Amino acid sequence: MARNKPLAKKLRLAKAMKQNRRVPVWVIVKTNRRVLTHPKRRHWRRTKLKE
């Protein structure tokens, strides 16, 4: 990836990075382990973003 990125692309990548987190532990505890997985979780090698 290029070192000099346009700001819009950089912001999109940052947003995708923030969204790509696990389900918080307090949510798992609160829902009594009904919610364990994150349906929109993305792996960097398997699923690529539209850039």
Curated annotation (Swiss-Prot):
* InterPro entries for this protein: Ribosomal_eL39, Ribosomal_eL39_CS, Ribosomal_eL39_dom_sf
Q: Which UniProt keywords apply?
A: Ribonucleoprotein, Ribosomal protein
Positions the record marks as coiled coil are none
Q: Name one GO molecular function term.
A: structural constituent of ribosome
Q: Name one GO biological process term.
A: translation
Tell whether Ribosomal protein is among the UniProt keywords.
yes
One term under GO cellular component: cytosolic large ribosomal subunit
Which PROSITE patterns does the record match to this protein?
Answer: RIBOSOMAL_L39E (PS00051)
Annotated Pfam families: Ribosomal_L39 (PF00832)
Q: Which NCBIfam families match?
A: PRK01242.1
Give the family from UniProt: Belongs to the eukaryotic ribosomal protein eL39 family.
Name under which the protein is recorded: Large ribosomal subunit protein eL39
**Naturally occurring in which organism (per UniProt):** Pyrococcus abyssi (strain GE5 / Orsay)
Name the gene behind this protein.
rpl39e
